[in-house]
Amino acid sequence: MLTEYTAPGESVEVGDDESIYSLLTGRIARTGEDTVIAERKTAPGQWMKVITGEFHKDVIAAAKGLIAFGIAKGNAVTIFSTTRYEWGVLDFALAAIGAVNVPIYDTDSAAQAERILNDSDVKLAIADNRERFDRLDSVIDRCPSLKHILMLDSNAMGALEGLGVTVSDEELEARIDSVHADDLATIVYTSGSTGAPKGAELSHRNFISITRAGSLALHEIILEDHPRLLLFLPLAHCFARFIQYASIASDDGVVGYLPDTKTLLPDLRSFEPTYLLGVPRVFEKVYNAASRKAGMGWKGRLFLKAAEAARDWSHMQQAGEKPTMKQTAEHLSYEASVYRTVRGALGPRIRYVACGGAPLDVSLAHFFNGIGLPMIQGYGMTETAAPFAANRVTDNVIGTVGQPAPGSSVRISDDGELQVKGPNVFRGYHNLPEKTAEAFTEDGWLKTGDLASIDDEGRITITGRKKDIIITAGGKNVSPIPMEQEIVKCPIVEHAVVVGDNRPFIGALVTLDLEGLAAWLPSVGLSADTPLDRIATVAAVHDEIQKYVDKANATVSRAESVRKFVVLDTQFTQENKCLTPSLKVVRPAVNRVFAQVIDQQLYSGKR
């Protein structure tokens, strides 16, 4: 095992005068304006092609409109929307004029949006629909810098185009020329260990470097054989921003923008992507849907046997072994009866799936690999403009997250933490110099907070998390502390521990406060000496705690909210290692001691 590794090859070149907008103009310079660059859904099963020239025209119109709106270089503009064509256009328009894109997740609450708007001094916010417009409008009086809110569903793009006619081509060109690679391009907010959101400042160079390096490392997926990407991850996530840029920057890549994932499976069939980018939960749902469709009878038994055979086939491939004639015949049989159908659910032209944003179940990766659909796992974080390392198509070692991009470096600290260095590493947290200093070592390496190992070929294996931040199976970063603090305000609660790492939703374990119970129980007709194991099952107890869970949930998005909690009939103590001598909760110990409760009562039946 290695303690430090630098990927061979030079870091990709990024000119000092380049911007994210240059990715688009570079494509036009190479291939002209007549190649299809995007598709937007117009009706069920119907997609409208957008050629590069039309996309560029829309970007220019939006850029001029933003200038006319008074957006100066360095001003912050928020996009509060699901993934849609206009999001992509606005992203490139903001980059072109040197404005700072401050995205807000479409699921964020009004309170979360307010914190982001004020911390980054947003001048203009653009929401997609009435619901999100109203969330912004409800806090505008408490956001001094926010002057205007536009709504895409009320023709915001048309309004920008109309305003932009007053801006000359020369004025626009002067703005474009004023933007440089090291200028701030975006502030992306991510949960911190204290619960307060931290705005990661990412430059144009950060994104351009990883876009080019990632495209070269994954050229079979992103650059070759007429690549088609259906983009449904939120563009507020750096992972999605990166892959959008990679598709736009390729010679003939096509990105389809999907605003609503409720119709994902039929949209996959009609759009026909060649590759997909998703978080583990997406592919878990595909697997679970196939399993449910097979049912409980003989078809269900066939699916389970085929799934196990696929994993065995993948393990055999990974070990470099050759199948026997019997194994080959079995594989061909399952290919005809099961594997082809599962792959077809992702579209008839699918060739690869890329996965990141949260830890991936190795058995799931082996399943997809075994059915002939290589799953490429990567690793990154907001602070690295999403991807930092990825498996290669020709070196896809399941269980690892691959090697870093060419010219980038990784190392393992004395306490096992993965630390990284490269041109896509962010410059710091907005308005938080102390947090920025804490994020880096004295010699300039970014501390990831993840525990890892590096093999002799430079492949990284993530072995755990050093920090408390929870990453759900859907890739959402959740800080548990603010939620826990709200729940323990309940007078009958002693401790609350939020869980959900690599799980489909956020849950919580709750212990009861004996003194608080003694005072409260008579109010619901129970004796103060009622046994704890009975109290834990009383509906009135759950109802009382639910009030505080609801209060906690009101401050966060649905993806971060506690969907289910379990009242324990025991307490955290120093004896069971769940409390320190200073009576602090030991989170890993709680997860270990109550693992069966978490698995069977919180997440029973869930993958």
Where do the model's predicted regions map?
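Conserved ATP-dependent adenylate/AMP-binding module captured primarily in the ANL superfamily
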Residues: 75, 108-138, 210-230, 261-275, ...
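Conserved ATP-binding/catalytic segment of the ANL
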Residues: 404-472
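Conserved AMP-binding/adenylation subdomain of ANL enzymes
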Residues: 208-228, 235-339, 349
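Conserved AMP-binding A3 loop
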Residues: 49-53, 185-211
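Conserved AMP-binding/adenylate-forming core of the ANL superfamily
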Residues: 16, 37-92, 109-114, 161-164, ...
